[in-house]
Amino acid sequence: MIDWITSQGQGVLGAYWTPLWILIRAVIIVVPLLLCVAYLILWERKLIGWMHVRIGPNRVGPLGLLQPIADVLKLLLKEVMMPTQVSRGMYLIAPLMVLMPAVAIWAVIPFQAEVVMADVNAGLLYVMAISSVGVYGVILAGWASNSKYAFIGAMRAAAQMVSYEIAMGFALVTVLMVAGSLNLSAIVNGQNTGYFADMGINILSWNWLPLLPMFGVYFISGVAETNRHPFDVVEGESEIVAGHMIEYSGMGFALFFLAEYINMIIISTMTALMFLGGWAPPFESVVTNAIPGFFWLLIKVFLLLSVFIWIRASFPRYRYDQIMRLGWKVFIPLTVAWLIIVAIWIKSPWNIWH
């Protein structure tokens, strides 16, 4: 589909098509992301409200649906306060260094068969590489802010992200081993073949079942990577107020939160693609096959995002040493052990993948 649009555009506009197409793709990615983040925040506040037996936002617009618009306007109109002793250049560029990798990842994420901005063969490697870059913006913000609280938060973020990146990487390596491809579309298609898929029970052929420990490790590590509760010691309110964001206000502060929620959506989308069959329906039938694959992916991502929120509402914050212990002493040994088990499984007569 993308190739057809490109060929048609080049035929009509010639050399002008390339910069125009880059701009169009950027808009196609960014605008829906902004809307998704705005209403994800509203859904989070609503869902936590219901879990706390209260209503949640319900004043701005019908049923509170305009609350995200009001929040955006509030942040846009706030004065940007810059402390006098900050490293100005690094202070200003840090929020962008956190946000840009989160946006760039969407270039290779497929939304259904043949609907992807760039269908590259090394898509999984690209995601793993780009997702590691955001921590530099966090470290830069902590260093440039000239604040002890911000610096402590940045150091915590660096240690936490490095710790859980390893476990996430091993979890994705197991998916790579069973799929035999780094292409995200090929990984999704590989989950919808086999004995159960032939019977029309796709849900039992997805990677979540044979790779169940990796599924859990990847998603929980994703919660830690995004600094979400109960892993939010990076911005622990009771200790360091807001961590690396403490000296930011207005849109600088908003960009950090925007990146956090975009990363939540990325983790949920990657979990759905790697372990939950992507855009495939759970069961084959006339009704489920009539629903476009994009909507199945959307449903899975929405449910995983709701789990993010449920975790926030249900668990207390871990201590910093507990978070490090979980990453290094539990997740990494577990993923290495399961990696070896899967390698032996693939080479055994009971191989269910190839």
UniProtKB/Swiss-Prot annotation:
A Gene Ontology molecular function term of the record = oxidoreductase activity, acting on NAD(P)H, quinone or similar compound as acceptor
Name recorded for this polypeptide: NADH-quinone oxidoreductase subunit H
- Keyword Lipoprotein found: no
Q: Which gene is transcribed and translated to give this protein?
A: nuoH
Question: Where, per UniProt, does this protein localize?
Answer: Cell inner membrane
Protein family? Belongs to the complex I subunit 1 family.
What domain of life is recorded for the organism? Bacteria
Question: Which residues span the membrane?
Answer: 22-42, 91-111, 124-144, 168-188, 203-223, 255-275, 291-311, 326-346
**One GO process term, biological-process aspect:** aerobic respiration
Quaternary context:
NDH-1 is composed of 14 different subunits. Subunits NuoA, H, J, K, L, M, N constitute the membrane sector of the complex.
Relate the protein's function as given in its record. NDH-1 shuttles electrons from NADH, via FMN and iron-sulfur (Fe-S) centers, to quinones in the respiratory chain. The immediate electron acceptor for the enzyme in this species is believed to be ubiquinone. Couples the redox reaction to proton translocation (for every two electrons transferred, four hydrogen ions are translocated across the cytoplasmic membrane), and thus conserves the redox energy in a proton gradient. This subunit may bind ubiquinone.
**Which keywords annotate this record?**
Cell inner membrane, Cell membrane, Membrane, NAD, Quinone, Translocase, Transmembrane, Transmembrane helix, Ubiquinone
Catalytic reactions of this protein: a quinone + NADH + 5 H(+)(in) = a quinol + NAD(+) + 4 H(+)(out)
Q: Which GO terms describe its cellular component?
A: plasma membrane
Q: From which organism does this entry originate?
A: Cupriavidus taiwanensis (strain DSM 17343 / BCRC 17206 / CCUG 44338 / CIP 107171 / LMG 19424 / R1) (Ralstonia taiwanensis (strain LMG 19424))
Task: Give the EC number(s) under which this enzyme is classified.
Answer: 7.1.1.-
Q: Specify the protein's topology with respect to the membrane.
A: Multi-pass membrane protein
